[in-house]
Amino acid sequence: MEKRVKYKSFVKDPGTLGSLELSEVMLLFVPNDPKSDLKLKVQTHNIKSQKYTKEGSNKPPWLNLTSKQGRSHIFEFENYPDMHACRDFITKALAKCEEEPNKLVVLTPAEQLSMAEFELRFKLLRENSELQKLHKQFVESKVLTEDEFWSTRKKLLGKDSIRKSKQQMGLKSMMVSGIKPSTDGRTNRVTFNLTSEIIFQIFAEKPAVRQAFINYVPKKMTEKDFWTKYFRAEYLYSTKNTAVAAAEAAEDEELAVFLKPDEILAQEARQKMRRVDPTLDMDADEGDDYTHLMDHGIQRDGTNDIIEPQNDQLKRSLLQDLNRHAAVVLEGRCINVQSEDTRIVAEALTRAKQVSKADGEITKDANQERLERMSRATEMEDLQAPQNFPLAPLSIKDPRDYFESQQGNILSEPRGAKASKRNVHEAYGLLKESILVIRMTGLSDPLIKPEVSFEVFSSLTRTISTAKNILGKNPQESFLDRLPKSTKDEVIHHWTSIQELVRHFWSSYPITTTYLSTKVGKLKDAMSNTYSLLDAMKQSVQSDLRHQVSLLVRPMQQALDAAFQHYESDLQRRTAKIT
Amino acid sequence: MPAIASKQYSDDVSLLVLLLDTNPLFWSTTSITFSQFLSHVLAFLNAVLGLNQLNQVVVIATGYSSCDYIYDSSLTSNHGNFESNGTGMPAIFGSLLKKLEEFVTKDEELSKEEVSEDRIPSCLLSGSLSMALCYIQRVFRSGHLHPQPRILCLQGSPDGPEQYVAVMNSIFSAQRLMVPIDSCYIGVQNSAFLQQASYITGGVHHTPKQLDGLFQYLTTIFATDLHSRGFVQLPKPIGVDFRASCFCHKKTIDMGYICSVCLSIFCEHHKKCSTCGSVFGQSKLDDASSASDKKRKAPST
């Protein structure tokens, strides 16, 4: 039951508009404004008393519910009949709660329902009329409980929860080298504007820079001095003079950190190469960027000059930068730190790296497995013995042997009615007597009665014409479309109901608790009731459609018959155990 | 006779092979007597012969223990006997009834010799179908001018599951020969064999509801020749009982196991196929994985 109300926490409260949803177990108030956090959930058995204004007085239709904890909830309805309906519903629910105090234990799981879950169930019932019909048929008549009904529909509930998952924020595809300074043109001073986003990207792509930041700031230098040195190093790279870079690196050891190859990245690459299966035919130990070969690799600034060997460590190729940047973008944002403090960001990234490094550590067993695979790969196939596949030889036997071997089965397992020799003899005598009769008397006159012949002809004509109309020349049309709409809806609803009952029935076996035994009894009664409804429906259908409806109803009855048979046999077995 | 008519067969010349159920265990339990049944059938056969002068009729008796030809309208011994012996019986069927009586006597003697008494009281449908197909094959080989053959099964006995393989083989042979099998079941149950036979071969299957009107059913549905069936609406089945019999216990099943080599049907899981000897359950992948498991465990021990 659902009504539109205005909720008040006290009498003079202006009130909040929303909808009041009532069930025998719970009372739920949802305001119309989604942003409002004034949502109310009250268990029925927690309601102590209710007061209401009388019709005909000057007051609006109010219903005041007092809980056992002393709180009051005032609902103002749109009209007095709505208020009376809710009042009567709550009165009945309260009476049931008092009549069945022992069943509160069964209702305990309902209390643990979250507000969102409860709203979701009501929403699903509101949207799906068929689901609402089933819910009304089974839950309100107490064949199933709320939890039993929804336990088979977790997909419906889970579908909405999937939508709540947030999409992870990615990274920009702009490279760090794309940062451009601003210049005033008159002096040689350039200015770099760093945002937290840029800093995050630098830390993600260059672990050595991140580690240097943690080591030097703020003990040895300020954050501004740190970034000044970093961009000085970047400037030296952009020039073509590696000799100047080497000279400055010799003087300033802190600047040299930015000019050396990133040792952390090299270590990670070596670990990844170690995880590669050694049976793969791959030169994983050789440099995969060809920088060890002369005249290979393009410099970042696009030049192709030959570099002197002693400054080889100061080189960085464009390919390495591109690969590193792509790896970082694909890895995505692995931490959710939104802090403006640069140190917190650097430390969080370092911890994330350490965690992933621990996960990727190679254990002893993995080493052993790698060694086994390595030794197995070195075997040469042409020196191995041919493998013997475990296949049985195929033999098509003589069919006569097959049929003769089956004779024993027939004798050992008798089937069908046993016909004694005396009965056979009498039957043969009767048959010969019939032949003698027809030889003596000949064909009967008349051979067939005219009214019988007409009846046969009429029924055949009706059968053939009916079959033509049903099968027809339109394969898209099914027989259900030819039924009246009410009968068709009834058939489909019965099918849905029987599926629900049968699913719960078979999932209750084996019966291990009293709860399951009670549940199976309820389901059996509900199935008996449905069986009677099926028979009534068959009789109420018109005579020309009855045969088709019988064909449609037969699988439903077979499913119910199987359930009844299992119920009776299981009941006998459990009764025999008790005896 | 003066001159044999030349063979000029048109589309509607038919050869009807009738399989007549003479199982005494069935006829002792029916509401209609065998003599009444024979009246309808003989009148029907006379009508078929009257539809076209060149039509042929062959009757095969299907007994409890044996089968035999009891009438063949193309034999010269059945021509020329036009004397009437005073009764209402046409003399043309005198030999049929005489042979039927002899057949029943022989069938009774054969049933006495049977050791097994636990058989389902079914008739030898597979045997009579095979004999009908042999006769039709001889007709096919006599020349390209021949009447169009079809088979009509008049049966009331229940299905014998032990004949499943033989019946299905006959049905597939008839399908290959393009010979339709019409079936008229007058028993109380449904016959899965006859339903499948008519469905597979393109014949007509019908279960009459009023047995005292059998002649009307036969002339309305089953007297139609193959050419005319293209213009006539005949009863169509709403559903076909496609259940099979298992090869191990010979009982009817609707769900079971099947050998992927020879397509034998079993009602329970076997380790080996009793027809072709294939071993079930053991496959190459299972052994390969177990072998690799052993190899992995050895070094760690």
UniProtKB/Swiss-Prot annotation, chain A:
GO terms for biological process: DNA-templated transcription; nucleotide-excision repair. Gene3D superfamilies: 6.10.140.1200, BSD domain (1.10.3970.10). The keyword Repeat applies. Keywords: DNA damage, DNA repair, Nucleus, Repeat, Transcription, Transcription regulation. InterPro entries: BSD_dom (IPR005607), BSD_dom_sf (IPR035925), Tfb1/GTF2H1 (IPR027079), TFIIH_BTF_p62_N (IPR013876). GO terms for cellular component: transcription factor TFIIH core complex. It comes from the Eukaryota. It is found in: Nucleus. Residues 107-161, 186-238 form the BSD domain. The keyword Nucleus applies. Transmembrane segments: none annotated. PANTHER family: TRANSCRIPTION INITIATION FACTOR IIH-RELATED (PTHR12856). Belongs to the TFB1 family. Component of the 7-subunit TFIIH core complex composed of XPB, XPD, TFB1/GTF2H1, GTF2H2/P44, TFB4/GTF2H3, TFB2/GTF2H4 and TFB5/GTF2H5, which is active in NER. The core complex associates with the 3-subunit CDK-activating kinase (CAK) module composed of CYCH1/cyclin H1, CDKD and MAT1/At4g30820 to form the 10-subunit holoenzyme (holo-TFIIH) active in transcription. Component of the general transcription and DNA repair factor IIH (TFIIH) core complex, which is involved in general and transcription-coupled nucleotide excision repair (NER) of damaged DNA and, when complexed to CAK, in RNA transcription by RNA polymerase II. In NER, TFIIH acts by opening DNA around the lesion to allow the excision of the damaged oligonucleotide and its replacement by a new DNA fragment. In transcription, TFIIH has an essential role in transcription initiation. This is General transcription and DNA repair factor IIH subunit TFB1-3. It comes from Arabidopsis thaliana (Mouse-ear cress).
UniProtKB/Swiss-Prot annotation, chain B:
The gene is TFB4. GO terms for biological process: nucleotide-excision repair; regulation of DNA-templated transcription. This is General transcription and DNA repair factor IIH subunit TFB4. Component of the general transcription and DNA repair factor IIH (TFIIH) core complex, which is involved in general and transcription-coupled nucleotide excision repair (NER) of damaged DNA and, when complexed to CAK, in RNA transcription by RNA polymerase II. In NER, TFIIH acts by opening DNA around the lesion to allow the excision of the damaged oligonucleotide and its replacement by a new DNA fragment. In transcription, TFIIH has an essential role in transcription initiation. Keywords: DNA damage, DNA repair, Metal-binding, Nucleus, Transcription, Transcription regulation, Zinc, Zinc-finger. A zinc finger (C4-type) spans 259-276. Component of the 7-subunit TFIIH core complex composed of XPB, XPD, TFB1/GTF2H1, GTF2H2/P44, TFB4/GTF2H3, TFB2/GTF2H4 and TFB5/GTF2H5, which is active in NER. The core complex associates with the 3-subunit CDK-activating kinase (CAK) module composed of CYCH1/cyclin H1, CDKD and MAT1/At4g30820 to form the 10-subunit holoenzyme (holo-TFIIH) active in transcription. It comes from the Eukaryota.
